[in-house]
From Swiss-Prot:
This is Pro-opiomelanocortin. Residues 99-122, 130-142, 172-186, 219-234 have a biased composition (Basic and acidic residues). The keyword Secreted applies. One of its GO terms (biological process) is regulation of corticosterone secretion. It comes from Macaca nemestrina (Pig-tailed macaque). ACTH and MSH are produced by the pituitary gland. Pfam families: ACTH_domain, NPP, Op_neuropeptide. The modification Phenylalanine amide is found at residue 87. InterPro entries: Mcrtin_ACTH_cent (IPR013531), Melanocortin_N (IPR013593), Opioid_neuropept (IPR013532), PMOC (IPR001941), POMC-derived_peptides (IPR050878). GO terms for cellular component: extracellular space; secretory granule. Keywords: Acetylation, Amidation, Cleavage on pair of basic residues, Endorphin, Glycoprotein, Hormone, Phosphoprotein, Secreted, Signal. GO terms for molecular function: G protein-coupled receptor binding; hormone activity.
Amino acid sequence: MPRSCCSRSGALLLALLLQASMEVRGWCLESSQCQDLTTESNLLECIRACKPDLSAETPVFPGNGDEQPLTENPRKYVMGHFRWDRFGRRNSSSGSAHQKREDVAAGEDRGLLPEGGPEPRGDGAGPGPREGKRSYSMEHFRWGKPVGKKRRPVKVYPNGAEDESAEAFPLEFKRELTGQRPRAGDGPDGPADDGAGPRADLEHSLLVAAEKKDEGPYRMEHFRWGSPPKDKRYGGFMTSEKSQTPLVTLFKNAIIKNAYKKGQ
């Protein structure tokens, strides 16, 4: 009696499952496992055969399709095609955007490496491609250069021999040499050679020029505005005293005439 009740309940359950499967697919009734349902073992085998197919089918929900529950977590949706992707590669549904960025970065790193150079080793001993890359410094801007490397002004003298002589001889020694100037034709042991005279004159002129340079302020005589001629000063308006004499005489005569008229 209990066995017959169990078989009846099993047959009822199988009938419900088969009815549900017939709405989706009716191949369970045609299978060999569901042909003989007289025994409990055959009934269980038929249920096991039809159960995975029923669970794999998409359920049909009544009503509007917009009100159906979501099949996946809403946080898994990531707009990977935008730049402000915040969830990262793990939470994104498709990692194509991240893969694309990594491919671009890898291509840039390959372009930085020289052709035919040694490839980085896989054991981790060699430095990565980004470690060997130099940091970007804005050297083409004024504020990109370091503070310590300032350019010093280079002093340029018009006559190199004059500067050498000024450094070689101190001021007291120069004055002693100018007081004891040797003659052009005589040397310390007697008459000098033909080239000794011009050489002595050159040294004496250099010493005199250096002494003048040390005594007074530096004047830029090699420029036009260093010492302009007197007749060119003030645009040529104020000329010499001789040229100013007729103008002064004219002013004096005018003043005298005005005073004479007022006295009358």
